[in-house]
UniProtKB/Swiss-Prot annotation:
This is Type VII secretion system protein EssC. The chain crosses the membrane at residues 230-252, 257-279. The keyword Transmembrane helix applies. The keyword Transmembrane applies. Pfam families: FtsK_SpoIIIE, FtsK_SpoIIIE_N. It is found in: Cell membrane. Residues 253-256 are extracellular. One of its GO terms (cellular component) is plasma membrane. The gene is essC. It comes from Staphylococcus aureus (strain Mu50 / ATCC 700699). Keywords: ATP-binding, Cell membrane, Membrane, Nucleotide-binding, Repeat, Transmembrane, Transmembrane helix, Virulence. SUPFAM superfamilies: P-loop containing nucleoside triphosphate hydrolases (SSF52540), SMAD/FHA domain (SSF49879).
């Protein structure tokens, strides 16, 4: 490793150089080293010899370059320049300079510097640097202006080319000049900050000093010695009495020798009695003394034994629970005791409260004498010994967090100090992998605990945040996640309780709550109020008084002062044990935390199996060209072996998977939870097969349920013959049908070549006997658990199909995240090999391997391969094909230059202004190895022109199908004079049974009428658009007429201008529809007459016979549902029944859409020969449309199912492709315009309809109204039926009635429009008693308004009639207009005979009469003259509804609309028609 120091214009920087990497130095902030005002860019790199160069100039120790403001000095240090020296052991000051008397002599220095106060560095953490004003001193690369400065441990000092690093025990030095010193040299190796094991820490074997537990028993003293209570005189008196009696007898009767014998014997008895007494007394005293001496010696030994046990206990406690000061030494020296405790140890989560008289770890057994009348001092001695050792004095008092919630009460600042001690103890001896802390505390107390943020245990790794909750934000951010974690752990315990297995949760969470107010309204409170020890969570509560504590607290600790505490209860038992807390005033807590923060705890030593290996590394190549794919394809033969590399067991130890039927295959299972590398191992296997075997020998069919990324990854791989995604209902059955079709195809080919196994066929293919390639087909499902859950029948059939197809070269590989409950007996028994990566739990591992091993896997890509019944069982690391492919070999040099700030929550917060990573001039996008290999295979395939294998699985129908992709759409090429039979191209059909997709074409003669049933919004209108344009493009407008009934949302309106369209109808155009119904009925009758006349059965035969053009009539109805409850429902349905029954032979065809089948009446529905179902919300409705179907209709716009023997699925075509530059309507308009311009022949007539307003002047010239008047008629308006001119013949009597005088006045205005012409032809006489004609009084021959004048007019009319009877018709006819006929009769008393004569003879003689009146008055009058006139007149205009008039008896009209202004009925010959008067 090299270090480079760069100095320029008072700026100093240091760079750790890594071999093979390049660096830049410039004034740009994005450079590796930024120097202000540098003025140039310096590139640092190594040449081929490994020498570092700056802009191609070698750096030999020192390189000086000219800069804009100052020289640029680059100073290069190597391992040889490094040294490390201890501080002097006696003095507190040392010098570094050029002089011989300096403690460290460096000749290159101009002036000396002084380093002092290093003897107290352990406490102060710094030394002082003193220098003169002529010496530039940099501390941490900042130039110091003061002459005396502090340098803390870890600080870097630079003085005149010398680099120093302050350490607690000495100085590290980098100098290119010799360093001479008498100081102790500490090490000769330069520290490598980037070494792989830098600051890594492995647990050492733990030394446990057990507390003595063997019982010590103090035996009771032996029974007291029994004292002889015989009194000496009892031995002396009897012989003395005998001597006395003997003397008395001798005195009475001297006997001689007998007396001597008796006296002698008595004397001897006396002597022996006395000696025996004193002898026994002496022996008793000795026995008593010995008993006492022996027992006291026994007690002394027991005392020593007890004392030894107590010392052993005290030592054990002091060893395992050292003081905080001792902990600091342990941490500082990186002692092996760090992180020594694990969750399996007996003292896990134990910590010291303080010093107290603690209970012995062993039992002292002594049985005190219950009762004795005599006091035995030895019993007192034994009791005294027993009572002396009741406790272990001044030993650590231990508490633990394993047995329920604990609580601290007392002053908060004292409790916080105790919690700090607990933090230090637990953090030092428990790894952050096993233990985490969460503090819920007041915001003002966070500063006190700020030092603890350095502890790795304070980071909640599951939430990636520090374990401090002190405000609303941190509460919501952390506690909600903790709540979920607790909930999951509780659920896990409940599930595991059924199997009686104990769960140890890691990490253990110590949940400290000093402020309950922060969680009082949070959902986590329900868990805080219970004991969570079982779930790996220890609760600690802090309150001022015991009354504030929750009821479930088991252990209570009262901190009374800094020197006194009391353990009140422990595990719910009252103990009241006082202790002395430890004083930690002189301990730097943050120093301990920082030292622990530097340690990276590695739990397990590295295995011989690599943690990861890339795909190309497994093949021991760097470039894809080196794979020699073509040669592998040429040499490898599947009928011999199918072994391909999958991973490594160790270095250079390749593990291969061979799915040859006689090896590991043909079928298998892959299991692995999320992030285990399950998909990657499948990808690597697919890639490995593709590299080793030709596309004609191996092919893949991927089942990617619900869609995913694997299908996209291999889309360009030639071996991929299909991907099955989104297997919903019918897609699952479609896939199964395709696979079964492939099996049938293979069986057919086997039969043709008289073989029964894929290997035999492959050999024939290699020999050229068989010509059609038939590769091994690998059906791979990346996630079959959900597929099996939602499509169980499909999975069952798939496994069964694979079992049948093993000899046909079918291989099934099923992968799942959670095999438990998914891998049934059928799947497991048919899967010869199993690949198990990391699974969620032991049950999953047992499910697939029948062992729990896979549950212990931690690395992604690590897997077990099991073949058969443990015939092969190996652990290996699978290859990773997603690695970056970089043939230049600099893929490891990509460096993230994002600068992060660690915020108050312990999270990384990017502070770069530009986070894009695109600051380089050129951004290089690297391929993955998988992409590179696929591209390489694709290029080989193209170069060798390899023929693609026929695909057994066609992709699902696209969601957009266009008519131009299915059939010719240029009408200019398609229109011809000869009428063609109609063929409708509906869309793209899918026939998986035949492995075919192509145009869905219907021959109209066979298809008949078409009914499409589908839910709204799924393409019903598009279906009609497609048919409209298909017909229009293939047939001229004179060959095909279309009537569009748009009962939906005006979807057919855009196509109304197509020249083939006769007319367009909406549901509210009742009159127009009624008129169309009559026209259709007339056309049916007309065409039937033609068939009858020419004795043919169809219009097609008529065309062939006569050569005449009778157009096809297409009736297209969108949303037939709207017919129901419409005013025209009955007549429309009756017409449609007739049309669907008779129209097909007449070349009149109906195509309709509806949302349900019962929208049509049964007779009509039966006549709809072709029924099509689109997606329907009511699934059962599909069966009503197409009958029993194999495939459901997908919930895709445009997808449909045709009723036929096989119920063909297809996707509706669209008449136009999507065009970014034009809207759909613009495309329609363009083609319509082109058709209109191209075609100059006849187009169909539309349905004539009454305009909203008809003005006399608008029609005067076009209809030649003056000529009509000149020919003896009054044009009055248009009829609604044919929109033809309606007129009143003046040569016949007529009667006009209306409801009100205003209408009469309007009628008068229209009648008199051509008054001049009338005057030329007629002598006009008007009898106008009501005044509606008075505007014309001066424009006519005679006008009568008053009663007498009316009589005169009447008399004139009678005389005129008589004169004409005598003389015959005059040169000029007369026209009499009688307005208000009722009043006229009242005035003139005209007889009935005169009325008859005027009506019958008048017109013959040129006397024309016109009656006008109010309808009600005419009806209510009882004048016979009116009745006579009504019966004899055959021209009527009635201005009220037919149902309301009483002139004639017509059938009642249901729901007849109200007569609008200017509307009337013309009645003639007992028939009526509705008209509208001119305006």
């Amino acid at each position: 490793m090299h270090k480079l120091i760069i100095k320029y214009n008072k700026q100093l920087k240091m760079l750790n150089l890594r071999d093979g990497k390049t660096y830049t130095i410039s004034e740009d902030e994005r450079a590796d080293i930024t120097l202000k005002s540098l003025g140039e860019v310096i590139h640092l790199e190594q040449n081929n010899q490994g020498t570092w160069q700056a802009n191609h100039t070698s750096i030999n120790k020192v390189l000086v370059r000219k800069g804009d403001l100052d020289d640029i000095t680059l100073q290069l240090y190597t391992e040889a320049d490094y040294a490390s020296f201890a501080y002097p052991s006696i003095q507190d000051t040392m010098t570094i300079g050029p002089n011989a008397y300096d403690d460290m002599v460096i000749q290159s220095l101009m002036n000396a510097i002084i380093i002092k106060d290093f003897q107290s560095i352990q406490e102060s953490q710094y030394v002082r640097i003193v220098h003169d004003k002529n010496t530039d001193v940099y501390i941490n690369y900042e130039l110091q202006e003061q002459l005396t400065n502090k340098a803390y441990i870890g600080d870097h000092i630079y003085v005149e080319g010398i680099w120093l690093e302050v350490q607690a025990d000495g100085l590290n030095v980098l100098s290119q000049n010799t360093v001479a010193s008498s100081l102790i040299r500490l090490t000769q190796e330069m520290p490598h900050a980037q070494a792989d094991d830098y600051n890594t820490y492995h647990r050492s074997p733990r030394i446990i000093h057990r507390e003595p537990t063997d019982d010590i028993k103090i035996e009771r003293p032996p029974q007291p010695i029994q004292k002889n209570n015989t009194v000496i005189w009892r031995s002396i008196i009897p012989p003395l009495v005998m001597i006395a009696l003997t003397v008395v007898i001798f005195l009475v009767r001297p006997i001689g020798i007998y007396i001597l014998m008796m006296i002698g014997m008595s004397t001897v008895t006396i002597v022996f009695g006395i000696t025996t007494y004193f002898s026994e007394k002496k022996k008793y005293n000795k026995d008593v003394e010995k008993r006492e001496k022996d027992y006291k010696a026994y007690l002394d030994n027991k005392s020593k034994e007890i004392n030894k046990a107590i010392k052993a206990q005290r030592f054990s406690l002091n060893y395992h629970y050292p003081t905080v000061a001792e902990i600091k030494d342990i941490v500082e020296t990186k002692a092996p005791r760090i992180y020594e405790k694990t969750s399996h140890h007996h003292d896990f989560l134990h910590y010291k409260l303080g010093i107290a008289n603690v209970e012995k770890s062993f039992k002292l057994d002594y049985q005190e004498e219950e009762f004795n009348q005599r006091r035995d001092e030895l019993f007192d001695d034994a009791k005294e010994l027993y009572e002396f050792y009741t406790d272990v004095e001044q030993a650590p008092l231990i508490n633990d967090l394993n047995h329920g919630p604990i609580a601290y009460i007392g002053a908060r600042h004292l409790i916080l100090e105790e919690l700090e001690k607990m933090l230090i103890q637990l953090s030092t001896f428990h790894s952050y992998h096993d233990l985490e802390f969460l503090f819920v505390t007041r915001e003002d107390e966070v500063e006190t605990l700020k030092w603890a943020r350095w502890l790795p245990h304070m980071t909640l790794r599951g939430q990636n945040i520090r374990g401090f909750v002190y405000n609303q934000r941190t509460r919501d951010q952390i506690l909600t996640s903790i709540y979920s974690m607790i909930k999951e752990r509780i659920q896990a315990v409940r599930e595991r309780s059924r199997s009686n297995e104990q769960i140890i949760f890691t990490p253990q969470l110590v949940f400290v709550i000093t402020d309950m107010s922060l969680i009082i309204d949070h959902v986590i409170l329900e868990y805080v109020n219970q004991d969570l020890s079982e779930y790996g969570i220890s609760l600690i509560f802090v309150e001022d008084v015991i009354e504030s504590l929750p009821e479930h607290v088991d252990t209570i600790i009262d901190i009374k002062s800094r020197t006194e505490g009391e353990l009140i209860t422990k595990e719910k038992e009252l103990v009241q044990l006082k202790f002395t807390p430890e004083n930690i005033d002189n301990v730097d807590k943050e120093y301990i935390a920082r030292r622990l923060a530097n340690l990276i705890h590695v739990e397990h030593l590295k295995n011989a199996i690599p943690d990861s290996i890339t795909f190309l590394e497994m093949y021991n190549v760097k470039e894809v060209d080196q794979l020699d794919v073509v040669n592998r394809w040429r040499q490898n033969e599947t009928y011999k072996t199918m072994a391909v590399p999958l991973g490594v067991r160790g270095k250079d130890d390749i593990l291969s998977l061979n799915l040859h039927e006689k090896a590991h295959g043909p079928h298998g299972l892959v299991a692995g939870t999320t992030g285990s590398g399950k998909s990657e191992i499948i990808q690597s296997y697919i890639l490995s097969l593709a590299i080793n075997f030709h596309p004609h020998e191996v092919a893949f069919l991927l089942i990617d349920y619900k869609g995913g990324g694997m299908a996209n990854l291999f889309k360009d791989l030639v071996h991929l013959v299909g991907t099955i995604t989104n297997l919903d209902g019918d897609e699952a059955m479609r896939a199964l049908t395709s696979i079964k079709a492939e099996l049938r195809k293979r069986q057919r080919l086997f039969g043709e070549h008289d073989v029964n196994h894929i290997n035999q066929y492959h050999k024939l293919f290699k020999e050229g006997v068989a010509t059609e390639p038939m590769p091994h087909l690998f059906i791979i499902s990346d996630e079959f658990a959900e597929l099996k859950s939602e499509q169980p029948d499909f999975m069952k059939e798939l496994v069964s199909t694979a079992r049948i197809g093993r000899s046909l070269g079918i291989h099934l590989i099923l992968a799942t995240q959670k095999p438990s409950g998914v891998v049934d007996d059928q799947i497991w028994s048919n899967s010869k090999f199993k690949l198990a990566l990391k699974v969620q739990d032991r049950q999953d591992s047992n499910e697939i391997l029948k062992t729990p091993d896979a549950a212990d896997i931690t690395l992604p890509g690590r897997a077990y391969l099991q073949v058969g019944n443990n015939e092969i069982y190996e652990l290996f690391q699978s290859a990773w094909s997603g690695a970056t492919y970089d043939i230049e070999g600099d893929k490891l040099e990509v460096e993230d230059k994002t600068i992060y700030m660690i915020n108050d929550y312990g999270q990384l917060q990017a502070i770069n202004k530009d986070l894009s990573g695109l600051e380089d001039e050129e951004t290089k996008e690297n391929q993955t190895e998988l992409e590179a290999v696929i591209d390489h295979i694709e290029s080989i395939t193209t170069r060798l022109e390899i023929e693609e294998v026929k695909r057994p699985w066609l992709p699902p129908l696209p969601e957009n199908v266009y008519q131009e992709d299915l059939v010719e759409t240029d009408f200019r090429k398609l229109w011809s004079d000869d009428a063609k039979e109609v063929e409708l191209t509906l869309g793209l059909k899918d026939v998986p049974e035949e492995q075919y997709q192509g145009p869905m074409v219907l021959q109209l003669k066979k298809a008949g009428h078409i009914a499409l049933i589908g839910s709204p919004g799924y393409g019903r209108t598009t279906f009609l658009h497609n048919i409209i344009f298909d017909v229009a493009r293939h047939h001229r407008p004179d060959q095909a007429h279309m009537y569009l009934f748009d009962f939906g949302t005006n979807g057919l309106m855009p196509v109304t201008d197509i020249p083939h369209v006769a007319d367009y109808f909406t549901v509210d155009q009742e009159d127009k529809i009624a008129k169309a119904i009559r026209i259709f009925n007339d056309e049916i009758d007309r065409r039937k007459k033609i068939l009858s006349q020419y004795r043919v059965t169809s219009i097609s035969e008529y065309r062939k016979l006569t050569g005449e053009t009778i157009p096809y009539v297409f009736i297209l109805i969108d949303n037939f549902d709207a017919v129901k409850d419409s005013p025209f429902q009955e007549v429309f349905e009756n017409m449609m029944i007739k049309m669907t029954r008779e129209g097909l032979a007449l070349d009149m065809q109906v195509t309709l859409t509806a949302s349900r089948a019962n929208a049509m009446k049964t007779p009509m529905y039966i006549n709809m020969k072709t029924r099509i179902a689109m997606f329907l919300y009511d699934k059962s409705e599909v069966s009503n449309v197409v009958g029993q179907q194999k495939f459901a209709v997908k919930d895709v716009v445009g997808r449909a199912l045709l009723s036929s023997d096989d119920n063909v699925s297809f996707h509706i075509g669209q008449p136009f492709k999507h065009d970014e530059t034009k809207s759909y309507n613009d495309q329609i308009n363009d083609e319509v315009s082109a058709m209109t311009e191209f075609y100059k022949g006849e187009t169909p007539n539309d349905i004539p309809m009454m305009p909203d307003e008809i003005k006399y002047e608008d029609y005067r010239e076009s209809l030649s109204l003056p000529d009509i008047v000149a020919n003896g008629a009054l044009p009055i308006g248009l009829d609604y039926e044919g929109v033809t001119l309606q007129k009143i013949k003046l040569t016949e009597p007529a009667m006009i009635s209306s409801e009100n005088p205003r209408e009469i006045a309007h009628i008068a205005e229209i009648m008199m429009k051509e008054i001049d012409i009338l005057n030329e032809k007629y002598a006009i006489c008007i009898a106008d008693s009501s005044g509606e004609f008075k505007a014309y009084r001066h424009q006519v021959a005679n006008f009568a308004e008053e009663r007498e004048d009316i009589k005169a007019i009447h008399q004139l009319m009678i005389e005129d009639l008589k004169q004409r009877e005598m003389d015959g018709p005059f040169e000029k006819d007369s026209l009499y207009i009688i307005n208000d006929f009722k009043t006229y009769i009242d005035c003139t008393y005209i007889p009935e005979d005169d009325v008859k004569k005027l009506i019958t003879k008048g017109p013959e003689l040129g006397l024309n009469i016109l009656f006008v009146g109010i309808h009600k008055e005419l009806i209510d009058a009882y004048d016979k003259q009116i009745d006579v006139a009504r019966k004899m007149i055959n021209q009527f205009s009635i201005g009220i509804r037919i149902s309301d008039q009483q002139f004639f008896k017509f059938r009642f009209i249901q729901r007849e609309p109200v007569i609008k202004e200017n509307e009337a009925y013309m009645v003639a010959n007992q028939a009526y028609q509705k008209i509208r008067w001119f305006k």
